[in-house]
């Protein structure tokens, strides 16, 4: 799996989301995303997803596990830095010096329609020991099964 750990990489205007930022949640943050990004399609990335209670934790892997989510592309590349900065605040990437980042934003390979594109993703930055694995890799499917 190809991961770049730089925070800003010119030319990457795609965003992959797998949790509460997905369209199925209809959250205020999704409404924000839909203003600055256009839906490109359902997609997947190599990784494992864990149930942290009130939110999911995606962790990158090199094995055959996949996380199901959605790929978005910025409507206006000139607004991308500002828009992604707002999402960084929401995801706990932008923290004070004495705080720990809840998530980290990186570039990863996204599989969509038999193609591979590079996109930003928010990976969980904490410990998932003892947390349930979401085996399907699809948070919406997992939550529907729990009902």
Annotate the PLM regions:
Residues 2-147:
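Glycine-aromatic micro-motifs
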């Amino acid at each position: 799996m190809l991961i770049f750990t730089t925070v800003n990489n010119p030319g990457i205007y795609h965003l992959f989301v797998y949790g509460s930022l997905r369209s199925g949640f209809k959250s205020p943050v999704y409404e924000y995303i839909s203003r600055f990004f256009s839906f490109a399609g359902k997609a997947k990335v190599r990784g494992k997803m864990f149930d942290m209670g009130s939110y999911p934790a995606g962790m990158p892997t090199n094995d055959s596990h996949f996380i199901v989510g959605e790929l978005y592309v910025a409507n206006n590349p000139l607004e991308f830095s500002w828009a992604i900065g707002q999402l960084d605040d929401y995801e706990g990437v932008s923290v004070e010096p004495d705080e720990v980042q809840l998530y980290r934003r990186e570039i990863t390979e996204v599989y969509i329609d038999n193609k591979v594109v590079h996109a930003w993703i928010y990976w969980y930055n904490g410990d998932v020991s003892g947390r349930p694995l979401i085996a399907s890799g699809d948070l919406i499917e997992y939550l529907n099964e729990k009902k």
